[in-house]
Design a protein with these regions (language model features):
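Transmembrane-lumen/periplasm boundary regions of multi-pass, lipid-linked membrane glycan transferases
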Residues: 102, 108-109, 260-261, 265-271, ...
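Signature aromatic-anchored transmembrane alpha helix within multi-pass, membrane-resident enzymes
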Residues: 9, 70-74, 191, 241-245, ...
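Start-transfer (signal-anchor) and selected internal transmembrane alpha helices
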Residues: 1-86, 290-300
Length: 639
């Protein structure tokens, strides 16, 4: 046995250790179901397996990281740790909506595994059709389980659960792109390219806000590494399995990564077809045909297997009207999206991209920038058929933009001797600028925090004010006072709760419920308001609530015309004296005053119809979310 082990490579020994660990986990899970140690140990094993998979992908892709690369990796991780520690510690951010979803999923996953091992795995698998799957929580439990389990802790722990594998694969991608671009000055190229990519603000943006969606980039980078220089000239079964696994992984992370997968596959197939046509014209017809046949066979088999593997998700996608339900988020289609992309990328990055395009044209190396450009355009066109992107959805375009950045980095590195000081200043200034960008829910243009706070145009003064309020809260004490009042006046055992009308980035029910994570003080005592057509149902809980909370001025932070909470609030204010009396008010210290209204008369059909009639347009589009919900509630209450 010792002789067999000694013959294994270092990576082989790692996989042998992982197999032994998996066997030990199985035995432990069967012997001690419900143990509080099982889920953290499972998460630790998954992270180790993912890191080993990353190393295996690098080897299959023909990329070897030497001591120089490893030293840069360790240094970058250390800088990232300091950055996260400083950035998270210098703000007071309240996690809500999408920013709290994964944290709550982590709590729920822990609770499920605390019941039993089987219950935990069922919880993970049952989410496959949801917008947020439980795939990421499987990896983020360790070391989150060792922390105070606050929102900031969850963001910081991604340094250990996400960043190591991500950095290793990004380093490999930088090297692979350098091979394709035939870079000679490899060390300068790696320093510039790797640092440029890793400091790109929208790489870390969602992670800083408690959304570990950048986890999907681990699998996206795997896919790029395995395919960028592979042309199906020979059959490579291990590579095919890794490509399939990477594709499944990126889709399981977040469903909208499918737009990247489709866009990249289209661009890759187009590249392969063009290269095969060129081969055929050069007299290598048989080689070109073999390429295309292998591509077609692999593509069909992989697509069929993927549909079977993700059949529940496929059924959900085919049976759900995403364009209709998410129309609220479609602000202006492809035209507005191109403008948004330009603002997010910024002038400094576009200068680099321009240098890269000039470099690729001069060296007659069009494949990489063309592949990236086609992937970006295809993904943009597909995504904007449903909606426009938020800052976290920018992640699905990151692989394409990074390939363009790397092409520009090659141009800088190869010509570093000319205008050396100017180029080094440009590089250093861009890194400092990128690291200073504020990662806020309202970030539209990638600007440092000091630039946002002192932006000279009066036209954006309201944006600056709201950005400050939402990113670094100054009203945490006031929010806690509201929480304490609701907690004291609502008895959950009697079914008493409050309903909050505001549903906005400035104020919403999530901020009050999750203001002191991991403690959820108002569990079952605060209901959320209606806001997004196609997403939120007619709020029948409003008619059951003991108290209703609203605010003056009513929060409406850059909402679209179809937003519903403002309309509901206007209806409430016009008729509240018939059913409510004022119970309390709270000055939030920033110009907003919350008022609590206590219901004095039980809801009747006339009151329900008063609100329902005001949403006739929404009812015509989504009757199952409005009139059917209202009628069902009325029937259930004998009205």
């Amino acid at each position: 046995m010792n002789r067999i082990v000694s013959r294994l490579s270092a990576l082989g020994k790692v996989w042998l250790g992982l197999a032994a660990g998996a066997l030990a986990l199985i035995v432990f899970g069967l012997a001690a179901p419900g143990s509080g140690l099982f889920f953290p140990l499972l998460s630790l094993w998954c992270n180790a397996a993912l890191f080993a998979l990353a190393l295996l992908v690098l080897r299959r892709a023909g990329v070897e990281l030497d001591l120089f690369h490893k030293a840069v990796l360790v240094g970058v991780w250390a800088v990232a740790a300091l950055y996260f520690f400083w950035a998270l510690g210098s703000r007071t951010f309240l996690y809500y909506w999408d920013y709290v979803n994964y944290i709550l999923k982590q709590y729920n996953a822990e609770a499920a595994f605390a019941q039993s091992t089987g219950a935990g795995f069922r919880f993970l698998l049952d989410s496959i059709t949801e917008d947020y799957t439980n795939f990421i929580p499987l990896f983020t439990e360790f070391p989150f389980c060792l922390s105070g389990k606050t929102g900031d802790d969850y963001a910081f722990c991604q340094l250990f659960s996400v960043l190591p594998s991500l950095l290793v694969l990004l380093a490999g991608l930088v090297c692979k792109a350098g091979q394709l671009l035939r870079v000679k000055n490899t060390r300068w190229y790696f320093l510039i390219g790797f640092s440029w990519c890793v400091t790109f603000p929208f790489l870390r943006m969602s992670a800083m806000l408690g959304q570990p969606d950048w986890f999907g980039l681990i699998f996206a980078f795997m896919l790029l590494l395995l395919t960028l220089d592979y042309r199906f000239d020979r059959i490579d079964l291990p590579r095919y399995l890794l490509i399939f696994a990477a594709t499944a992984g990126v889709i399981l992370t977040r469903r909208w990564y499918l737009y990247f997968v489709v866009g990249y596959c289209f661009a890759y197939v187009l590249l392969l077809v063009v290269s095969s046509v060129r081969l055929a014209k050069s007299g290598q017809q048989s080689r070109a045909v073999r390429r295309l046949v292998r591509l077609a066979v692999f593509g069909l088999c992989a697509a069929g297997a993927m549909v079977l593997l993700l059949l529940p998700m496929v059924r959900k996608i085919l049976g759900f009207d995403y364009a209709g339900r998410y129309s609220y988020y479609n602000f202006g289609g492809i035209t507005l999206e191109l403008a948004a992309q330009a603002l997010r990328i910024g002038l400094l990055n576009f200068i680099l991209i321009g240098l890269g395009l000039w470099f690729a044209a001069k060296r007659r190396l069009p494949a990489l920038p063309c592949l990236a450009g086609v992937e970006l355009l295809t993904s943009l066109l597909l995504f904007t058929r449903v909606q426009n992107t938020g800052s976290h959805q920018m992640l699905l375009f990151v692989p394409g933009w990074l390939l363009l950045f790397l092409t520009g980095s090659a141009a800088l590195a190869e010509g570093i001797r000319k205008h050396r000081k100017l180029k080094l200043f440009y590089w250093a200034f861009t890194l400092v600028f990128a690291m200073s960008v504020r990662c806020s829910p309202l970030t539209t243009v990638a600007l440092p925090g000091f630039a946002v706070d002192h932006f000279p145009l009066k036209a954006v003064s309201e944006f600056v004010r709201l950005d400050k309020l939402t990113y670094d809260r100054t009203d945490a004490a006031q929010i806690q006072r509201v929480d304490d009042w609701i907690d004291a006046h609502c008895d959950a055992e009697k079914g008493e709760f409050a309903y909050m009308i505001p549903h906005d980035m400035l104020y919403n029910s999530d901020m009050f419920q999750y203001a002191a994570l991991p403690d959820i003080q108002l569990q079952g005592k605060l209901a959320a308001g209606i806001s997004i057509p196609g997403t939120h149902e007619f709020p029948v809980r409003f008619f059951e609530a003991k108290y209703v909370l609203t605010a003056e001025p009513f929060p409406q932070t850059f909402v679209s015309g179809g937003e519903l909470s403002g309309r509901w609030n206007a209806l409430f204010c016009a008729a509240r004296d018939e059913h409510f009396t004022q119970a309390a008010s709270f000055d939030m210290g920033n110009g907003t005053v919350f008022t609590v209204w206590e219901r004095t008369e039980p809801a009747d059909r006339a009151e329900v119809e008063y609100y329902l009639d005001a949403f006739a347009q929404e009812d015509a589009l989504y009757p199952e979310m409005f009139s059917q919900v209202a009628e069902s509630w009325l029937a259930g209450h004998g009205l």
